[in-house]
């Protein structure tokens, strides 16, 4: 995660990581804002689905070194990488919409819903 300070910083982070030793073999990098818990996959997926536009925020690099053991690569040691910028976009990045704040559910509500979950019939 990053505390974004300027447009394009997420892509700069991706490129920097891919340029560092063994991290060059990383197949997919997802960059999120500092408000996203990178250890909680639900939060990462939330960031991707609410802050990413596929055309604007994905980077694909073709014909680049990959892990020898990557079974998806078309050739041994040569394949593609995917970068996803799942950070909140700014006006400077061409984002003209109102930024939506993340709604956090309080612990009491979570406990209530969890205790009643079986009765919902879902």
Give a label for each model feature:
Residues 1-122:
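Charged, compositionally biased interaction regions
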């Amino acid at each position: 995660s990053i505390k974004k300070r300027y447009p394009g910083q997420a892509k700069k982070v991706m490129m920097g990581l891919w340029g560092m030793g063994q991290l060059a073999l990383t197949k997919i990098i997802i960059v999120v804002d500092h408000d996203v818990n990178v250890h909680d996959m639900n939060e990462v997926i939330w960031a991707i689905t609410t802050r990413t536009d596929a055309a604007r925020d994905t980077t694909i690099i073709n014909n680049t070194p990959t892990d020898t053991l990557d079974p998806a690569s078309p050739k041994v040691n040569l394949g593609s990488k995917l970068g996803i910028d799942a950070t909140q976009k700014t006006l400077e990045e061409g984002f003209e919409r109102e930024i939506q704040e993340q709604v956090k559910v309080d612990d009491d509500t979570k406990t209530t819903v969890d205790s009643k979950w079986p009765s919902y019939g879902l």
